[in-house]
Amino acid sequence: MDPKLLDILVCPLCKSPLLYRKPENELICKADRLAFPIRDGIPIMLEDEARRLPVEEEISR
């Protein structure tokens, strides 16, 4: 994932910064506990495509 792109992408719902999880190939919004997938190098920033993170799943930087 391009670091410059990561600097400008925010959560489409709350506008919070996103964390990049390389192993899962996801962008994480801590505030909304959503994981947005990255497919073929393209972040899919749609709420319907995001995975809800369970409360027990730790979100770390």
Curated annotation (Swiss-Prot):
Pfam family of the protein (one): Trm112p
InterPro entries: Trm112-like (IPR005651)
Highest rank taxon of the organism: Bacteria
Gene3D superfamilies membership: 2.20.25.10
An annotated GO cellular component: cytosol
Protein family (similarity comment): Belongs to the UPF0434 family.
Protein's name according to its UniProt entry: UPF0434 protein Nmul_A1027
Organism: Nitrosospira multiformis (strain ATCC 25196 / NCIMB 11849 / C 71)
